[in-house]
Amino acid sequence: MKTRQRKRLFVSAALAVSLTMTVPMPASVNAAASDVTFTINTQSERAAISPNIYGTNQDLSGTENWSSRRLGGNRLTGYNWENNASSAGRDWLHYSDDFLCGNGGVPDTDCDKPGAVVTAFHDKSLENGAYSIVTLQMAGYVSRDKNGPVDESETAPSPRWDKVEFAKNAPFSLQPHLNDGQVYMDEEVNFLVNRYGNASTSTGIKAYSLDNEPALWSETHPRIHPEQLQAAELVAKSIDLSKAVKNVDPHAEIFGPALYGFGAYLSLQDAPGWPSLQGNYSWFIDYYLDQMKNAHTQNGKRLLDVLDVHWYPEAQGGGQRIVFGGAGNIDTQKARVQAPRSLWDPAYQEDSWIGTWFSSYLPLIPKLQSSIQTYYPGTKLAITESSYGGDNHISGGIATADALGIFGKYGVYAANYWQTEDNTDYTSAAYKLYRNYDGNKSGFGSIKVDAATSDTENSSVYASVTDEENSELHLIVLNKNFDDPINATFQLSGDKTYTSGRVWGFDQTGSDITEQAAITNINNNQFTYTLPPLSAYHIVLKADSTEPVNSDLVVQYKDGDRNNATDNQIKPHFNIQNKGTSPVDLSSLTLRYYFTKDSSAAMNGWIDWAKLGGSNIQISFGNHNGADSDTYAELGFSSGAGSIAEGGQSGEIQLRMSKADWSNFNEANDYSFDGAKTAYIDWDRVTLYQDGQLVWGIEP
């Protein structure tokens, strides 16, 4: 994909005719909303959710907490890792320049250093704990220089290009020869492995993509690959490049063939010679998978780990496609919120030439998975470019949130958003709903469980738990109706009784994620909640009580305010004991004290004294919905706090808190308060966490 809208060429007669057909509009979604029932079973359909589905090709606001990042797009087809030159191709006057340096935050002084674009990209992935997918070059040539437009007379081979060789077949160099006219892919991988370690290490690059959208090379990069790509050529290149990568880093995952869309899935964009190869294959994807499996057998190792496709829906409404045109009219917006159903729902038919002429290939994810199961079992599935348009409209936010839930529910391994509009506030909100709903990088659970809705047209629901204990249940619920609220009934089943819930979300009034009314009416694992029109909510349900794991850490407490429960300050004092046989790093611990503010004022906090040094303790405040508490104070410890020796203790920590307006508290109803405790005593109403896991106390 490029930064401007690409052309889609479909040269087969059937496709050409299909673009002129009048297609019936989908059924209206504006009927009055009825009551909806959501059923969730934490014991059914359990499976891990791949963390890589919350990925991107652009970083947007930087608050989305991306799980995977891809260095890809049309620019990467002509990228020269030796000097960081690249070609814009037809996207922008066939320019060869240093665009990728500026776009990737590489300083001008570093732009001539080998691999600078890739290392800057991966350094940022490491900084954010994200999985990296790096595109390698396979079309045949890359930019030799950064000297601007390349004339048609300078089409490769010419002095404006270096030839791509997959294997060097000679000793590697970390300072590649810049004037030999060759660029070696295995030498690039060796350069990266030398810098970061191989893919099995914590810092290594995990995945490489076999170029980008090869079916469009003759359209997007005619100076590099002017002839239309043939199916056998793509397979041969894929095998040879994958072998070269795996010979250097056998742990790396190979993504391919990065097909741009349905025309490529079907026939590699009517590739020359495809009819003679098709045989009994239902589409090109079957042929590609089968050939890569044969190569696996012949070479004794897997050469394709992840089937990689791109998906920009062709669905339309009101005469306008849902992507590449902003929010669109009201019918476009309605089509957009329904469009993710083409990923999974056999009962749905979208308004598009695909839905009209090739409906047997939809829904898409089951079709792709069927091809994998038939022709190359064990291959994973990725959608490394996608967008549902309307990035700054509620319809785009809801469609994106729906797609993310679908990716998790139906076993997609990796998925990466591609930015098609300047303002992406609602798309950003959709990702944050899963990955940073509270501003503290809290996210959807890692294990999906069974969730269903009684009304797939007007609503969606996705469910997950955070661990095998099912103590925290996460729900994403969407109201896709444009006019009416949904009166939702939630019916939960499983091995836990849930007693309270907090809710975050966004809606058509704004893209900011805000905390909504808490859930306090759960009775026998059933409750009701009203979802406004066009809204997306993340519900976090807590089980009856969260018990700490078996631990040698103990929190002692006393009231430092001598049972003065109605003044304008709270003064809890703490001591942390380590009864184990190994020291405990204090920086791995956080402590929480729960109370009621008795107002909406902001909170302030101070450490009056601490044996380990008040400057080594950080105070923060969070909202909480539980018994006798609406707020908690959290203490964190810096590395300067040191550790608690085996059999030792932290020493006294004196916390003092007040409201910004200095109004009085009523501590008598506070969960963690006990004015009778004037000397230190073990107190399980103050909680302690080690590396985020509860190790002492009982949460309210």
Curated annotation (Swiss-Prot):
<dbReference type="GO" id="GO:0030245">
    <property type="term" value="P:cellulose catabolic process"/>
</dbReference>
<keyword id="KW-0624">Polysaccharide degradation</keyword>
<keyword id="KW-0378">Hydrolase</keyword>
<comment type="similarity">
    <text>Belongs to the glycosyl hydrolase 44 (cellulase J) family.</text>
</comment>
<dbReference type="InterPro" id="IPR001956">
    <property type="entry name" value="CBM3"/>
</dbReference>
<dbReference type="InterPro" id="IPR017853">
    <property type="entry name" value="Glycoside_hydrolase_SF"/>
</dbReference>
<keyword id="KW-0119">Carbohydrate metabolism</keyword>
<dbReference type="Pfam" id="PF12891">
    <property type="entry name" value="Glyco_hydro_44"/>
</dbReference>
<keyword id="KW-0732">Signal</keyword>
<feature type="domain" description="CBM3">
    <location>
        <begin position="550"/>
        <end position="700"/>
    </location>
</feature>
<dbReference type="InterPro" id="IPR008965">
    <property type="entry name" value="CBM2/CBM3_carb-bd_dom_sf"/>
</dbReference>
<keyword id="KW-0326">Glycosidase</keyword>
<dbReference type="GO" id="GO:0008810">
    <property type="term" value="F:cellulase activity"/>
</dbReference>
<dbReference type="GO" id="GO:0030248">
    <property type="term" value="F:cellulose binding"/>
</dbReference>
<dbReference type="InterPro" id="IPR013780">
    <property type="entry name" value="Glyco_hydro_b"/>
</dbReference>
<feature type="active site">
    <location>
        <position position="213"/>
    </location>
</feature>
<protein>
    <recommendedName>
        <fullName>Endoglucanase A</fullName>
        <ecNumber>3.2.1.4</ecNumber>
    </recommendedName>
</protein>
<dbReference type="Pfam" id="PF00942">
    <property type="entry name" value="CBM_3"/>
</dbReference>
<feature type="signal peptide">
    <location>
        <begin position="1"/>
        <end position="33"/>
    </location>
</feature>
<keyword id="KW-0136">Cellulose degradation</keyword>
<dbReference type="InterPro" id="IPR036966">
    <property type="entry name" value="CBM3_sf"/>
</dbReference>
<dbReference type="InterPro" id="IPR024745">
    <property type="entry name" value="GH44_cat"/>
</dbReference>
